[in-house]
Amino acid sequence: MKVRASVKKICEKCNVIRRRGRVMVICVNPKHKQRQG
């Protein structure tokens, strides 16, 4: 899980979602998981 100021899609399988007021990226590739922080 990467914590970044700006989250972006890395590949076409990444999805930007909101969980508990946080913007997150979930993907089939675990390296692409990101959270805004």
From Swiss-Prot:
Keywords: Ribonucleoprotein, Ribosomal protein
This protein's GO CC annotations: cytoplasm; ribonucleoprotein complex; ribosome
Superkingdom of this protein's organism: Bacteria
The keyword Transferase appears for this protein: no
Keyword Membrane: no
UniProt GO BP: translation
Pfam families in alphabetical order: Ribosomal_L36 (PF00444)
Molecular function via GO: structural constituent of ribosome
Family to which the UniProt record says this protein belongs: Belongs to the bacterial ribosomal protein bL36 family.
Classification via HAMAP family: Ribosomal_bL36
Protein known as: Large ribosomal subunit protein bL36
Organism of this sequence: Nostoc sp. (strain PCC 7120 / SAG 25.82 / UTEX 2576)
Gene behind the chain: rpmJ
